[in-house]
């Protein structure tokens, strides 16, 4: 299963659990925010954002690295 399907299953499960325990939308959001999955997603998002910001702020480092030239083969 891919991550999108697992995320949908997780949200639906949380909705069912909340409905059984008298649904309160605020507690549902709080529970989702504190879940392990949400923490992993936030950490991954922060990491990707940090990497993107570093690439945008310092593009000269990438441009300075020349592309490797393929060596000519002898026959």
Curated annotation (Swiss-Prot):
GO biological process terms held by the UniProt record: defense response to bacterium; defense response to fungus; killing of cells of another organism
Cellular component terms per the entry's GO annotation: extracellular region
Signal peptide interval: 1-22
Tissue occurrence: Expressed by the venom gland.
Membrane-crossing segments per the record: none
Main location (coarse class): secreted
Keywords: Antibiotic, Antimicrobial, Cleavage on pair of basic residues, Cytolysis, Fungicide, Secreted, Signal, Toxin
Task performed by this protein: Insecticidal toxin and antimicrobial peptide with potent activity against both Gram-negative and -positive bacteria, as well as against fungi. Acts by disrupting bacterial membrane integrity. Shows broad-spectrum and highly potent bactericidal activities against the Gram-positive bacteria B.cereus, B.megaterium, B.subtilis, M.luteus, S.aureus, S.epidermidis, S.warneri, S.griseus, S.scabiei, S.mutans, S.salivarius, and S.sanguinis.
Record comment regarding domains: Amphipathic and cationic peptide with an alpha-helical structure.
Protein name: Meucin-49
């Amino acid at each position: 299963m891919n991550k999108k399907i697992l995320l949908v299953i997780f949200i639906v499960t949380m909705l069912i659990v909340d409905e059984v325990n008298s649904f309160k939308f605020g507690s549902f959001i709080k529970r989702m925010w504190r879940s392990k999955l949400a923490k992993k997603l936030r950490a991954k998002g922060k990491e990707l954002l940090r990497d993107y910001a570093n690439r945008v702020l310092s593009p000269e480092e990438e441009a300075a690295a020349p592309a490797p030239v393929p060596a000519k083969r002898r026959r």
